[in-house]
């Protein structure tokens, strides 16, 4: 595993302090990963050590005590962390999505997510309460009820799913639909753990990515006062800075985790074939079929890494991609996940039967990588977006 290079991707036009996950910390995180997986436990010690190392502040401006990293550099950190512990990278990455969303909003002249940056600067852990059962519209509609309190605040009632960091968050984003006015509005706000009326079910027992503890969440009329309501948007797709900031950071930081998983699978395969010797005494690494397979895997990961890096840099540099933004973001995420799953599966085939042991790291990666298909945007959703971008909407 190598440290992330964070010399690029810092806040444009501002000072930045390069930040890396130190090798000794990476090693401890990697050592704990099998135990968290086996026990289906939250990565609490990883969070404690990363918080102490400044990880929760890497995207916070230097003036507020952070490192000022942009999306490109944060993606590199996530890729490195995922090589040590995919579930830790995925779960804690939800915090980084909010930090980078706030950065994108700020870079585009808005300040409504300043409280997100302020809380991250105080080392508070941010989580997402967005996904809902059966809601394929994700940010563009909600089955959660947002009831106005008459003073600018709201009470939220509904069910959220895949709430990563459930045991540990300090601040949870919520959104729901207010249907009391002439037109329905989607209301976004933030809940503090001390607010109460938020219930997490102990129902996270999954094939992989177990240390995220992404539990089902019940909102029992939780009250969010006016000063923690950040946006009210129309139902349906829109280009609001909140939507863009969250969408860009989510898709690319998710993609980065799965690129890191693929990188680790290649490293494990290379190590395994380097130690194996055929019956005739020749090293397995000299087998032309093995060499061709690993060459193909290396090329596939190089290609998707370049795509993620280029698009993250475009976000940092505020490139004007217009209507191309969303097709590029969903396509890159979908390709990253598909590539990672292919790479892990092929790495297992190249390594052979030892990879099939439940104790093998590759076997754990094979389970973890399959979570990628369940994060928005799915392959089918991405395909619909891409088709619409070239053919227009269906009749």
Region locations from a protein language model:
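Glycine-rich flavin
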Residues: 44-51, 58-159, 164
């Amino acid at each position: 595993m190598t440290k992330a290079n964070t010399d690029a991707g810092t806040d444009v036009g501002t000072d930045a302090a390069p930040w890396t996950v130190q090798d000794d910390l990476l090693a401890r995180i990697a050592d704990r990963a099998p135990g968290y997986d086996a026990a289906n436990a939250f990565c609490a010690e990883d969070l404690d050590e990363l918080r102490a190392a400044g990880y929760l502040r890497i995207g916070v401006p230097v003036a507020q005590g952070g490192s000022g990293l942009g999306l490109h550099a944060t993606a590199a950190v996530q890729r490195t962390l995922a090589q040590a512990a995919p579930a830790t990278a995925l779960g804690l990455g939800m915090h980084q999505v909010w930090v980078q969303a706030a950065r994108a909003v700020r870079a585009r002249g808005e300040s409504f997510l300043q409280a997100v940056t302020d809380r991250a600067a105080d080392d508070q852990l941010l989580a997402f309460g967005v996904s809902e059962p059966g809601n394929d519209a994700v940010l563009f509609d909600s089955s959660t009820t947002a009831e106005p309190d008459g003073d600018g605040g709201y009470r939220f009632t509904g069910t959220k799913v895949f709430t990563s960091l459930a045991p540990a968050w300090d601040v949870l984003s919520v959104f729901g639909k207010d249907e009391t006015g002439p037109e329905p509005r989607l209301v976004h706000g933030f809940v503090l753990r001390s607010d109460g009326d938020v219930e997490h079910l102990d129902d996270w027992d999954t094939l992989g990515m177990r240390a995220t503890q992404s539990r089902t969440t019940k909102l029992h009329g939780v009250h969010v006062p006016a000063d923690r309501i950040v946006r009210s948007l129309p139902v349906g797709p829109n280009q609001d800075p909140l939507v863009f900031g969250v969408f860009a950071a989510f898709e690319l930081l998710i993609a980065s985790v799965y690129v890191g998983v693929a990188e680790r699978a290649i490293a494990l395969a290379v190590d395994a074939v380097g130690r194996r010797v055929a019956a005739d005494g020749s090293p397995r690494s000299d087998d032309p079929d093995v060499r061709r397979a690993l060459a193909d895997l290396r090329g596939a990961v190089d290609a998707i890494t370049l795509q993620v890096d280029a698009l993250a840099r475009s976000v940092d540099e505020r490139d004007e991609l217009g209507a191309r933004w969303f097709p590029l973001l969903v396509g890159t995420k979908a390709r990253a996940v598909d590539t990672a799953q292919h790479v892990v599966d092929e790495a297992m085939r190249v390594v052979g039967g030892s990879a099939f042991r439940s104790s093998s790291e590759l076997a754990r990666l094979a389970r973890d990588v399959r979570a990628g298909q369940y994060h928005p945007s799915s392959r089918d959703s991405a395909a619909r977006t891409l088709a619409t971008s070239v053919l227009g909407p269906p009749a």
